[in-house]
Amino acid sequence: MATPSQHDLRNDFRALLASSECYFTASVFDPMSARIAADLGFEVGILGGSVASLQVLAAPDFALITLSEFVEQATRIGRVTRLPVIADADHGYGNALNVMRTITELERAGVAALTIEDTLLPAQYGHKSTDLIPLDEGVGKMRAALEARIDPAMAIIARTNAGQLDDEAAVERVCAYQAAGVDAICLVGVRDFDHLERLAAPLDIPLMLVTYGNPELRDRARLAALGVRVVVNGHAAYFAAIKATYDCLREQRDIAASELNASQLATRYSTLDEYREWARDYMDVKE
């Protein structure tokens, strides 16, 4: 089957945003997973930054992967995908000028959309790992992203962590990003539907929600009614692949089955505890 053009896939994603439905993403992390997701009927996929870090570096989600490494993985997926893919571009790999470079490279890679977040990344000395950059800086990044885009069909999505802010500050951020001209808002840290309603009320553009499977946010019809068009429940397919690989290799070595789950395996083999210790020792990063 022929692979659609990058522009066609971007228009497909635009159609999702313009619809009245809510779509759940497939976690795609390599060309094979992208093909499987399309064959199973998923309408949209996402290449997560955390998943790319695990897949490319076997490292945790500490903003360690470089733009070039992330773009290489996105390009591999882009060569074969038959569904639009959102790239989780983290903080844009630096300041507003770095964001412009990120947009250029990911557009060439063929992604249909990308998110730029306002988290203070990489983690800074003495800060919490969840701290956000100043609002003015965040707006500058979004404006830079829009300026760097060549194909207007590629969607630029502003991402912020509503769980780290009070409602007033969160609304101020999303409204500022909407005013900057982004195509959608991605919210992380939404607690429940009451919280979502307060954040969505002043917005006129579509929403993307990262829920990590939050049971308080499972009603797809209600999500759609509030303007949520894309939901990321997590990256279960990738973690299932880790678990399947581990169990298969243990069996080949005639080692008894393990009780470790996929999350525990990812923690062990990404050496997450070491990275956390280094961040505390060398950077005084707060959890």
From Swiss-Prot:
Co-factor remark: Binds 1 Mg(2+) ion per subunit.
Pfam families, alphabetized: PEP_mutase
Gene Ontology terms, MF aspect: magnesium ion binding; methylisocitrate lyase activity; oxaloacetate decarboxylase activity
Domain of life: Bacteria
Keywords, comma-separated and alphabetical: Decarboxylase, Lyase, Magnesium, Metal-binding
E.C. designation(s): 4.1.1.112
UniProt-annotated binding residues for substrate: S50, R159, H235
Biological process according to GO: oxaloacetate metabolic process; propionate catabolic process, 2-methylcitrate cycle; pyruvate biosynthetic process
InterPro entries reported for this sequence: ICL/PEPM, Oxaloacetate_deCOase_bac, Pyrv/PenolPyrv_kinase-like_dom, Pyrv_kinase-like_dom_sf
Top EC group: lyase
Required co-factors: Mg(2+)
Ribosomal protein found in the keyword field: no
KW Lyase (keyword) present: yes
Reactions this protein catalyses: oxaloacetate + H(+) = pyruvate + CO2
Binding positions for Mg(2+) per the UniProt entry: D88
Self-association and partners: Homotetramer; dimer of dimers.
Role: Catalyzes the decarboxylation of oxaloacetate into pyruvate. Seems to play a role in maintaining cellular concentrations of bicarbonate and pyruvate.
PANTHER family: OXALOACETATE DECARBOXYLASE, PHOSPHOENOLPYRUVATE CARBOXYLASE
HAMAP family, per database record: OadC (MF_01299)
Name used for this protein in its record: Oxaloacetate decarboxylase
